[in-house]
């Protein structure tokens, strides 16, 4: 089992009993592993027998230490960090490992899921393109992705809304769960009658069901 030093790398949230699976959960570009979004989602997942290990990319850890915002590192740096964390996990633990991430974190995970032999992949608000630049697609690898993948996406996401995504070529391994009236942070409009807290609980339920069936 993992030692204390190993777990110091992560924010761990465990279910009361034996977990069905472990999710390595990465943050988006602007908010780190302790964001309310990821904290709440981790608690909801634990209630559904899913263990999460959240982590900060090095640029975010530096930003936290310095008390100021920093831009994300280049993709190769982020991908290297993902690889290192998965290697550390596999050296310390065994069992099904799922890669997961919000926005940028999910995109980086999607680039590595097949390479790393992940049991599955969860993307929360996948950034199909930069905001305001729908011509700059980040979808080429999604057409051939073999890893079972769940993308949870707001219908109004400015980085890939429902109408846009309908026109993309996605691999059969990918399932998209749409959140009505929600934005990139899965926050719905008031007229939906739902709060973001309720949406995150529903999202955790979708993830747990996907994990139970193995995607």
Regions found by a protein language model. Name each.
Residues 182, 186, 190-215:
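Catalytic active-site module of serine/aspartate enzymes centered on a nucleophile-bearing elbow/loop
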Residues 158-164:
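Conserved alpha/beta-hydrolase "acid-adjacent" motif
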Residues 96-101, 124:
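Short beta-strand immediately N-terminal to the catalytic nucleophile in serine-hydrolase-like folds
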Residues 101-105, 109:
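Gly/Ala-rich beta-loop-alpha elbow adjacent to hydrolase catalytic centers
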Residues 108-112, 132:
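Hydrolases whose catalytic domains are alpha/beta-hydrolase-1, hotdog thioesterase
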Residues 144-146, 151-153, 157:
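Short beta-strand/loop motif that positions the catalytic acidic residue
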């Amino acid at each position: 089992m993992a030692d204390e030093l190993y777990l110091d790398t992560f924010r761990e949230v465990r279910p009361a009993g034996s977990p069905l699976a472990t999710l390595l959960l990465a943050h988006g570009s602007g908010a780190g592993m302790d964001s309310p979004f990821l904290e709440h989602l981790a608690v909801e997942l634990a209630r559904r027998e899913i263990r999460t290990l959240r982590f900060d990319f090095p640029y975010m850890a530096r930003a936290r230490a310095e008390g100021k915002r920093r831009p994300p590192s280049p993709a190769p740096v982020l991908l290297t960090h993902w690889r290192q964390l998965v290697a550390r996990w596999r050296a310390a633990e065994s069992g099904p490992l799922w890669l997961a991430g919000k926005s940028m974190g999910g995109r980086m995970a999607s680039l590595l899921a097949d390479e790393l032999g992940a049991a599955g992949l969860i993307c929360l608000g996948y950034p199909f393109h930069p905001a305001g630049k729908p011509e700059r697609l980040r979808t080429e690898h999604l057409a051939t992705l073999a890893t079972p993948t769940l993308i949870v996406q707001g219908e109004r996401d400015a980085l890939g809304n429902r109408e846009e995504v309908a026109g993309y070529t996605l691999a059969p391994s990918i399932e998209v769960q749409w959140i009505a009236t929600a934005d990139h942070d899965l926050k719905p409009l008031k007229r939906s009658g739902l709060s973001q807290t309720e949406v995150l609980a529903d999202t955790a339920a979708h993830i747990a069901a996907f994990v139970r069936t193995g995607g």
